[in-house]
Amino acid sequence: MNLHEYQAKDLLESYGLKVQKGIVAHNPNEAAQAFDQLGGKFAVIKAQVHAGGRGKAGGVKVVKSSQEAREVAESLIGKNLVTFQTDAEGQPVNSVGIFEDVYPVTRELYLGAVVDRSSRKVTFMASTEGGVDIEEVAHNSPEKILKVEVDPLVGLQPFQAREVAFKLGLEGKQINDFVKTMLGAYKAFIECDFALFEINPLAVRENGEIVCVDGKINLDSNALYRHPKLLALRDKSQENAKELKASEHELNYVALEGNIGCMVNGAGLAMATMDIIQLYGGKPANFLDVGGGATKERVIEAFKLILDDENVKAVLINIFGGIVRCDMIAEAIIEAVKEVNVTVPVVVRLEGNNAEKGAKILADSGLKLIPADGLADAADKVVKSLG
């Protein structure tokens, strides 16, 4: 689950980090009032969407008066912002953040952390190249990114943060401020179950103060049951409508750009299914895992979800029966096909628990379903069904 910038800054500030002060506004009048309340000569207005690249897309503007703040807010709120991280429709802008002017600054740094699956540790990354796309820095100048792996038994140690501060070229009070920032960020990461966080840029002001000018936080969705207050910050308007609907039925769904819909039980099998579709010349329209303990109702909802996509021209159902029984899946498929007006070819591959019984149920249904014997046969048939 992603947080908006203003939410991320509020959370980081509660852990002792110095952040760029700001006020969220949901309409132009609130934006004008926020400018006056901040009291500076300048302010920065940022569209609050769950996507990067806002500046290049026109979602970040510097304003010099309350009237200008009102006009910029009016041009953003209620519109969709399209960035390189969104689809063609973009993300809806329901609010803007009006932030204090912290410039001029002497330096812009980068600080971030992720759960590194290879090392199975929280890994911090820092760089002197803040304020730019960190992916570009990683690609073009990987030596400019410092990495610190944190031992989960002892947590991030002050000496590790000091070492990073020295390598970033900080000096004097800046070193202590950076150590506090990094330790506070780690504490927030662990206590709030972050999956990822970024401060880009982490600015060094002319007076030596270190300030978080931006904030990006992604929370581990599997841990949200432990954080009801954070869950309350969820903005469903920023989520893909199909993925949101899928989550409500405990389905793991990711929309893709192909034309072959996939319904599979198990994430690994789902990945393999997409790979073999690609191998046979097709393009998957989605990743959809109905789970190891799929119910009839969940399978029906999954089928509806796939067919809601106008780009889907064929469907491949690939089920390996373990906990879930193939005969139950077969009954759910029949019910779903009858309930939804299916006009595209549907290829079904069943293996495992009650697979033969499931295949017989499908064969006796009278529906125009295409049976497949094995994964390769299923991929071949679904690609050929497109003509």
Swiss-Prot record:
Entry EC number(s)? 6.2.1.5
Reactions this protein catalyses: succinate + ATP + CoA = succinyl-CoA + ADP + phosphate; GTP + succinate + CoA = succinyl-CoA + GDP + phosphate
Query: Which segments constitute the ATP-grasp domain?
Result: 9-245
Q: Which PROSITE patterns match?
A: ATP_GRASP, SUCCINYL_COA_LIG_3
* InterPro entries in alphabetical order: ATP-grasp, ATP-grasp_succ-CoA_synth-type, ATP_grasp_subdomain_1, Succ-CoA_synthase_bsu_CS, SUCC_ACL_C, Succ_CoA_ligase-like_bsu, Succinyl-CoA_synth-like
The entry's free-text remark on the cofactor is: Binds 1 Mg(2+) ion per subunit.
Please name the pathway.
Carbohydrate metabolism; tricarboxylic acid cycle; succinate from succinyl-CoA (ligase route): step 1/1
Which cofactors are named for this entry?
Mg(2+)
Question: In which residues is substrate bound?
Answer: N265, G322, I323, V324
Positions binding Mg(2+) in this chain are N200, D214
In Swiss-Prot or TrEMBL terms, this protein is called Succinate--CoA ligase [ADP-forming] subunit beta
Which family is this sequence assigned to? Answer: Belongs to the succinate/malate CoA ligase beta subunit family.
Subunit details for this protein? Heterotetramer of two alpha and two beta subunits.
Write out the entry's keywords from A to Z: ATP-binding, Ligase, Magnesium, Metal-binding, Nucleotide-binding, Tricarboxylic acid cycle
Per the UniProt entry, what are the Gene Ontology biological process annotations, in alphabetical order? succinyl-CoA metabolic process; tricarboxylic acid cycle
Q: What does this protein do?
A: Succinyl-CoA synthetase functions in the citric acid cycle (TCA), coupling the hydrolysis of succinyl-CoA to the synthesis of either ATP or GTP and thus represents the only step of substrate-level phosphorylation in the TCA. The beta subunit provides nucleotide specificity of the enzyme and binds the substrate succinate, while the binding sites for coenzyme A and phosphate are found in the alpha subunit.
Give the organism the record lists.
Francisella tularensis subsp. holarctica (strain OSU18)
Q: Which residues bind ATP?
A: K46, G53, R54, G55, E100, Y103, E108
Q: Which GO terms describe its cellular component?
A: cytosol; succinate-CoA ligase complex
Question: GO molecular-function annotation terms?
Answer: ATP binding; magnesium ion binding; succinate-CoA ligase (ADP-forming) activity; succinate-CoA ligase (GDP-forming) activity
